Design a protein with these regions (language model features):
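N-terminal glycine-rich anion-binding loop in soluble enzyme alpha/beta folds
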Residues: 2-71, 137-175
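Conserved beta-alpha
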Residues: 103, 107-166, 246-248
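Periplasmic-binding protein-like
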Residues: 82-87, 135-136, 191-198
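Short, well-structured alpha-helical segments in soluble
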Residues: 65-79, 179-191
Length: 248
């Protein structure tokens, strides 16, 4: 095989800044998370061990196992991520604000680089948008959903109303129509934004049209996770028509 002269070859391979994604065992939306990633950045995931049982409070509490979460850093460390994101909403809010801070700090100390959790990212996103009142839509059962409402209250975020789908498995299969209807029928008035929980609930293509319909930002768990992780490395997310991406 004859190769062209050196001058005819493209420069490469491309230089990319890597983000390490620590995911729960059942995360199925890696492809959606990647849609917010700009050129020059790549996302690399490691998963915590599989746990049997439905997605209920017991499983969520078991997911928040620092040893298992930090073991993922060992799996990803060889490629030297510039930042880490723990991509599970419920496991990062289940122990409240103190628990979220402790988890994020444990990841930062173990990795030696900046880190964020999904719940911390959601709070950062609401702060960036100057939002203090939200309506909450979640796929979980009511027990987990109310734990999220309590977490937000700890952060001085007022929840005007909330609704849940009551699901305990296969959340990634929820149709956009189902999520949109859940958001439209949320109780209460006066919310400055809608918060859409769970990194296994698909949202990318819903955000812009729902924001246009509702007239307020729609902040999803996946959107906020990638947005916050990119901010740690000085980059911006890709999300045409999405308030969080375009206003902050």
């Amino acid at each position: 095989m004859t190769l062209p002269a050196t001058g005819g070859l493209p420069e490469g391979p491309p230089v990319r800044t890597r983000i390490g994604l620590i995911a729960p065992f059942d995360l199925a939306l890696d492809d959606e998370l990647a849609r917010w990633i700009p050129d020059g950045v790549s996302l690399h995931a490691a998963r915590t061990p599989r746990l049997p049982g439905p997605v209920d409070l017991n499983l969520v509490e078991r997911l928040n196992d620092h040893d298992q979460i930090l073991a993922c850093i060992g799996e990803l460390g060889a490629i030297e991520p510039a930042a880490y994101a723990y991509a599970c909403t419920a496991a990062s809010f289940v122990d409240g604000i103190t628990g979220e801070h402790a988890l994020a700090e444990a990841i930062r100390l173990a990795a030696g680089v900046p880190a964020v959790t999904t719940s911390g990212a959601l709070l950062a996103a609401l702060t960036a948008l100057e939002v203090r009142t939200v309506a909450v839509a979640a796929p979980y059962d009511i027990v987990i959903t109310e734990r999220l409402v309590r977490f937000l209250a700890e952060a001085a975020i007022t929840v005007t109303g909330y609704g849940s789908l009551g699901l305990t498995s296969r959340i990634w299969e929820v149709p956009y129509r189902t999520t949109a209807e859940l958001i439209r029928r949320l109780p209460g008035t006066g919310a400055e934004a809608v918060l859409l929980a769970c990194t296994n609930l698909s949202s990318y293509d819903l955000i812009a049209p729902l924001e246009a319909e509702l007239g307020v930002p729609v902040v999803s768990a996946n959107q906020a996770t990638v947005w916050a992780a990119l901010r740690l490395i000085g980059r911006r997310a890709v999300g045409p028509g999405q308030a969080l991406v375009e206003r902050t």
